[in-house]
UniProtKB/Swiss-Prot annotation:
Organism (species): Lactuca sativa
Domain of life: Eukaryota
Protein name per UniProt: ATP synthase subunit beta, chloroplastic
Keyword Heme assigned: no
Alphabetical keyword list: ATP synthesis, ATP-binding, CF(1), Chloroplast, Hydrogen ion transport, Ion transport, Membrane, Nucleotide-binding, Plastid, Thylakoid, Translocase, Transport
Origin organism lineage: Eukaryota, Viridiplantae, Streptophyta, Embryophyta, Tracheophyta
GO CC, alphabetical: chloroplast thylakoid membrane; proton-transporting ATP synthase complex
Subunit structure as annotated in this protein's UniProt entry: F-type ATPases have 2 components, CF(1) - the catalytic core - and CF(0) - the membrane proton channel. CF(1) has five subunits: alpha(3), beta(3), gamma(1), delta(1), epsilon(1). CF(0) has four main subunits: a(1), b(1), b'(1) and c(9-12).
Stored PROSITE patterns: ATPASE_ALPHA_BETA
Pfam families: ATP-synt_ab, ATP-synt_ab_N, ATP-synt_VA_C
InterPro entries, sorted: AAA+_ATPase, ATP-synt_VA_C, ATP_synth_F1_bsu, ATPase_a/bsu_AS, ATPase_alpha/beta_chains, ATPase_F1/V1/A1_a/bsu_N, ATPase_F1/V1/A1_a/bsu_N_sf, ATPase_F1/V1/A1_a/bsu_nucl-bd
Length: 498
């Protein structure tokens, strides 16, 4: 299934002439196209506008049919800029939805929403393509096994573990470290699990997309010398793209991931940065199509659009797609319809806190706000569950005491509460960790901490064995042995100063 119609040497399309329509109206990225009676395209069909602009430059714009208006007219949304289009231009109905290349040929490459490579590394093998609109797997195909997906990040593995084949939301406002955490996860998963990842950059900064690409080349996730050996495919629809492209780029990335799951029978990681921008683009398109806005100005079809994307992200008997989605929270308000709708689909939430980021604790994951359906004794085991609950209780007690400390000071607390506060502060710092992808900024080498090692470290803090160590020894270290070594170094340094 090809995305664009082929053209013969004379420039005449090989598609039937009767599939030609004409542009009747252009309003920004929305086109109204008139077709001959009885030749109306279906909803979601790809339309191609070919011609020349006023300067004589060739134009090739792909659109997607969104509405049938009556009077033999359809309304379509453009996937690229509509500059230079004029009324009366020919429009070709391809007779099929947008289709994108899939399979091993996509690894190590950057694509746009149409599945066209944008990395200047030459054409991509398009012998295998999938349409971006597909139905979710049937009930009987779904896999219901529960197992944990180890990330090597202490705070995540201990307090809000990810489910293999699950959906995880990364919640946070602007500038608290969502994209850095995603880059670390891609790095850890490629190195520790050898899995294939697909990254969908939905409506984010072009600079960040470029930084991510360079970072992946440096870390070897993208193999420059042998591109097919790469572990990730990138699909970008950035902030400067029209809303149609930003609304569909998530589906393009998902379609590529589905091929690895269904045909190659692999476990795949799908990163979407940022799912809020998908909703935002849908809202823009909805307004352009003239639909009445719903709560807070969002589109009335918000739940349907989100559901059609999320239901395709699942585990089947063939393989799994584990999805990690960054969710921008407008004005840090978790009750906004966009994050609230996303919550309903998630197995785990990793909430990033501005307060922790301000303290310099990275990753700034809020240990009390982050949740996971996997944190149950029958899934993770009694030892992991009990340690996680005790860590949360200690941190919760510290949070309750903070007002008293602010007004009266630490000395007014009971002996037991003072001990709890001291341990909570150590735990808070031990939940920080140096990242591989942040080595350039921190100067500390990155650390991957296994789950057993993480549990052992927190048990030692909770048991009181490390009560004598200074709290700064626990800051930005990997496992607990590094913390004790750091404490000895700090002690030696202070002795030398004396």
């Amino acid at each position: 299934m090809r995305m664009n119609p082929t053209t013969s040497g004379s420039g005449v399309t090989t598609l039937d002439k009767k599939t030609l329509g004409r542009i009747a109206q252009i309003i920004g990225p929305v086109l109204d196209v008139a077709f001959p009676p009885g030749k109306m395209p279906n909803i979601y069909n790809a339309l191609v506008v070919k011609g020349r602009d006023t300067a004589g430059q060739p134009i090739n714009v792909t659109c997607e049919v969104q509405q049938l208006l009556g009077n033999n007219r359809v309304r379509a949304v453009a996937m690229s800029a509509t500059d230079g289009l004029t009324r009366g231009m020919d429009v070709i109905d391809t007779g099929a939805p947008l289709s994108v290349p899939v399979g091993g040929a996509t690894l190590g490459r950057i694509f746009n929403v149409l599945g066209e490579p944008v990395d200047n590394l030459g054409p991509v093998d398009t012998s295998t393509t999938f349409p971006i609109h597909r139905s979710a797997p049937a009930f009987i195909q779904l896999d219901t096994k529960l197992s944990i997906f180890e990330t090597g990040i202490k705070v995540v593995d201990l307090l809000a573990p990810y489910r293999r084949g699950g959906k995880i939301g990364l919640f946070g406002g602007a500038g608290v470290g969502k994209t850095v955490l995603i880059m670390e996860l891609i790095n850890n998963i490629a190195k520790a699990h050898g899995g294939v990842s697909v990254f969908g950059g939905v409506g984010e900064r072009t600079r960040e997309g470029n930084d991510l690409y360079m970072e992946m080349k440096e870390s070897g996730v993208i193999n420059e010398k042998n591109i097919p050996e790469s572990k990730v495919a990138l699909v970008y629809g950035q902030m400067n793209e029209p809303p149609g492209a930003r609304m569909r780029v998530g589906l393009t990335a998902l379609t590529m991931a589905e091929y690895f799951r269904d045909v190659n029978e692999q476990d795949v990681l799908l990163f979407i940065d940022n799912i809020f921008r998908f909703v935002q683009a849908g809202s823009e398109v909805s307004a352009l199509l003239g639909r009445m806005p719903s709560a807070v100005g969002y589109q009335p079809t918000l739940s349907t659009e989100m559901g059609s994307l999320q239901e395709r992200i699942t585990s089947t008997k063939e393989g799994s797609i584990t999805s990690i989605q960054a969710v921008y929270v407008p004005a840090d308000d978790l009750t906004d319809p966009a994050p609230a709708t996303t919550f309903a689909h998630l197995d785990a939430t990793t909430v990033l806190s501005r307060g922790l980021a301000a303290k310099g604790i990275y990753p700034a994951v809020d240990p009390l706000d982050s949740t996971s359906t996997m944190l149950q004794p029958r899934i993770v085991g009694e030892e992991h569950y009990d340690t996680a609950q005790e860590v949360k209780q200690t941190l919760q007690r510290y949070k309750e005491l903070q007002d008293i400390i602010a007004i009266l000071g630490l000395d007014e607390l009971s002996e037991e509460d003072r001990l709890t506060v001291a341990r909570a502060r150590k735990i808070e710092r031990f939940l920080s960790q140096p990242f591989f992808v942040a080595e350039v900024f921190t100067g500390s080498p990155g650390k991957y901490v296994g789950l057993a090692e993480t549990i052992r470290g927190f048990q030692l803090i909770l048991s009181g064995e490390l009560d004598g160590l200074p709290e700064q020894a626990f800051y930005l270290v990997g496992n607990i042995d590094e913390a004790t070594a750091k404490a000895m170094n700090l002690e030696m340094e202070s002795n030398l100063k004396k």
